Amino acid sequence: VNSGVLAYSEDASTPAELTIQGGKVETSANGANGVFAYGSSTINLENATVTTTGEGGSGGIMVAGGGTLYAKDCNVTTEGGSSAAIRSDRGSGLMVVDGGTYIANGSKGTGPPAIYCVADITVSNATMQAGNAQALCFEGRNPAHIYNSYLEGNYTASDDDENCNVMVYQSMSGDAAEGTSYCTM
């Protein structure tokens, strides 16, 4: 698993827990996430700056495989294609974000959303922007809860696709459970 910071445990009887207060996390490799909670792990991230510049899924803060991540007052910026600022993937998880700025600046065509939702994600009191993509993308049966926040997307179709700022889809890769996604704002 390629990340600047990773908390990982496969065994619920020996969970991993990591707390980071302040500091900077920077990654530049393709596919390198900034801060990633996987499996039976929990990350508490507060007042930190996270920057990723690699292509191909270099998310800012991420959960997968059932991981849990709490982010408070962080500044997260991603520059690569398919690199959401708030990212989740196969196996779901829980992410709770309170305050801060989360910006995804990937290039047009592969631009990442501000939030890529394959987990239970709650965001409050935050600013989220996608420079060249939908603001929010749901894959499969997953909820997003957004309160007292600013969420902006900038997706414009390059072919016959519809212009939209929220995308909901079900991939056939098995990354996400089938069912209904929903968003509360």
Positions of PLM-derived features:
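Surface-exposed loop/turn motifs in large extracellular/passenger domains
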Residues: 1-28, 36-54, 61-82, 87-108, ...
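A well-structured
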Residues: 33
